[in-house]
Structure formats: structure tokens, C-alpha cells
Amino acid sequence: MKLSHLAAALSAQLVAPVAAGYLRQDILTAGTLRNTTVPAAPNEDLNQIVSDSQLLSLHRTICEIESVSNHESTVGEALIKYLGEHDFTTEKQIVPVDEDDDSTDERYNVWAYPKGSPKPKIILTSHIDTVPPHINYSLHAPEGDFDRANITIKGRGTVDAKASVAAMIIAALDHMKESPDVPVGLLFVVSEERGGTGMIHFSDSELNTSPPFFHTLIFGEPTELKLVDGHKGNLRFDVEAKGVSAHSGYPWLGHSAISEILPVLARIDGLGDIPVEDGGLPSSEKYGSTTLNIGTVRGGAAGNVVPESASASVAVRLADGTVEDAQDIIRKAVADASGGSKNITLKFPDDKAYPPIDLDTDVDGFELLTVNYGTDIPKLDIHDEDSDVKVKRYLYGPGTILVAHGVDEGLTVGDLEKAVEGYSKLIDAAVKRG
């Protein structure tokens, strides 16, 4: 082979997968982030830029610590130390490890408030756990001309939700410098990614008083620096089918559980597209259609055995109505599709189900956004029924959910810094409430 031909062949082999990688990333993130690594501009030290910033260095510190759900103790210790060094009184709220995990870590929620102010009227809260696997923190210079704001920070938790944690802390510290008695508290919870155990624990604790001592809750999640006016509800259920096993050559001697469950799943799969009057799940102008995801399907032992059991798990994102109404619609749909078969069982094991959550947006200067993902917000019961002052709930944060939980999770320095301004604006509005 001629040298020129060899060079061309090698070039094609190298370029093709790279091009495919760019295309995939562009589709996944809709142009939000590019999966590229460009050398930094001359004389620009990315690590030094981070080290010179209180915000960026705090964010790096907590993102470099692995804190997959049920293993949050180390990042909790780092936050306790940092907040204690910056005039916060800190408390650990021990949270038992989830039953299905064998971790021996003593993990806990971090509750912090300015010294002498144990009952702050404003609470900023986010979560310190992440989904697996841990991905190392890394810095990536922008394409083309160097712009500090366009440095990309990648790694697990850099967006969801340690960006919110870091920005909240700095926003609170900035207010404390100007007004040491600002009534702001910080609550960083564990296990948001595993059902909200941390927030449920706080909700059930003596800190969640009736009536509340706080009048404003500011939640942190990736919202693209927009103020969220609400998110869909959440409901989960399982479908199980029973059959009778037999040799596949003589199927009439048995009864297929998979044949039982298939028409039921087909009916379930379309409930979000069917009008309510025809037996479907509700939609709304604000949240759009209710969506269903058949996340797992299991059944059978082998291809030559009539299956004696089958099951499926389903997640529902509710766009309107109550959990109870949705469950009734699902029950009727399953009964209709199965012909009332006693071989089909429907189970609603999730006692954490909730309807759509409407949030406050009465602070000027923000774009508004409605999101489909769930949060810890419905896990915190607010006991303000008999209070003259109703608790306001805001949801805001840097980064986009489109990259959260993915291999390219990340955000820009500019977005992280703008989040401090956004949280400060929300704190200012809350302070004016008294």
C-alpha cells in the first residue's frame, strides 16, 4: 500500500468515530454542550481560575467527592467543615441507609443557619447525593477565542445538584456579609435520587414545625437558570400475570403469562394519548399530556417453555388530576384489557405518589419553565393551613436536566456564576416578606 493511501485510510478510521460522537452528543443535548476538548488559550490555567474563585473552588471540592446515594457521608463532612468556617452553626440529621443498600456509611442531612438564628425564615435546599457511576471532575476550555465564562465543568454532580449547592452557599454568604442577621438557612439532603429519604426524614422531624417558622423555601435543581412554575406529578405501579408452565411443543397444556400481560401493557402504553372521556389519563394546558413509561418487563424461563409468570413496572408523569383518580383510570383500563382476568394483578406500591406540583413565580426578572422531572418538593409537608403567612416555594438552578445523569454531565462557569445572582434575587425578595 502506498504511504498516501495508508495515511488516508488511518485518517478515515479516526475521523469517522469522532464525527459520530459529535453527532450523538449534539442530538442528546440540543446544542447545549459539545463533547469537545480544546486546549486552553496560551497562559490560561484552568485550575488556577477555579482556585481563584470562592464559588468555583467550593464547587470543585464537593464534585470531586463521590456521593452516590447512600454514600454521602464524606461530602457531608466537607460541607459541615466549610460552613462551620464561614460562621454557620451546623447540625447533622442522621438518615438511615435505604433498606435495599448494604452501605455502612453514617449519612445525614446537613442543616445550617447563621449563629444565633436557629429558626431562619428563608431556607435554601438541594441534595448532595448523585446517581451512579461517579465521573471524575474535569475542566474543558472553550472553542475558539478564550472566554472564562465558557469554560465547561464536567463530572457527576457538577449539574445535579452540586451546582445548586455551591451557588446557594455563596449567595447566602454574600448576603451575610452585607447583613449578618439575614434569616437564611441551608438544608442539604441525602437520597433525593433514591426516593427522597432525606427530605422525608426532615419533613417528619421536629425541625418541620406547625406552623412553620419559615415562610420561603428555595429548592435547587437544574432549571437552565429559569424559575420553574411547576412540575408533573409522579405515580408508579406494577402489573403481574400468572400462567401455567408447559412444554412449548404442547402449549395447550399450559397457559402463557406473557400472552396474558401483553394486551394489558398495550392498553397501558396508550393511556396518555386517549381522551379522558374514552378512558385515558388527563392532560392540561400547563403540563401537556400525562406520559407513561413501561420501564421493565420480565417473564418466562426459556424460549421452549410456556411462561408461568410475567411482570412489568410502569412510571407515570401526571399532567392533571389526583393520584386517586389516575389509579382508578388505570385499574379500569387493566380490567378492560384483560377481560377481568384473575390472572392479572395490579399493584400500587409507591406511597410517595403525588399530583402535579404548582410553584411560586412572583419574583420579577426570570424566564419561566415547566419541567417533567420529579423533585423533593412534594416530600416536604408544609403545615401552614392555620397560619396567616403561607409558605412560598421556588425552584431554580444552573445547568440543564438534558445532561444530568449522563456521561457528559456538565455546565459552564458562566451559568454557575449567574446562578449565584439568581439565588440572591430570590433571597432579596424573601427578605422583603419579613
Swiss-Prot record:
Zn(2+) 2 binds at residue 160. Zn(2+) 1 binds at residues 160, 193. One of its GO terms (biological process) is proteolysis. It comes from the Eukaryota. Residues 1-20 form the signal peptide. The active site is at residue 192. PANTHER family: ACETYLORNITHINE DEACETYLASE (PTHR43808), PEPTIDASE M20 DIMERISATION DOMAIN-CONTAINING PROTEIN (PTHR43808:SF8). Belongs to the peptidase M20A family. This is Probable carboxypeptidase BDBG_01803. It comes from Blastomyces gilchristii (strain SLH14081). The lineage of its organism: Eukaryota, Fungi, Dikarya, Ascomycota, Pezizomycotina.
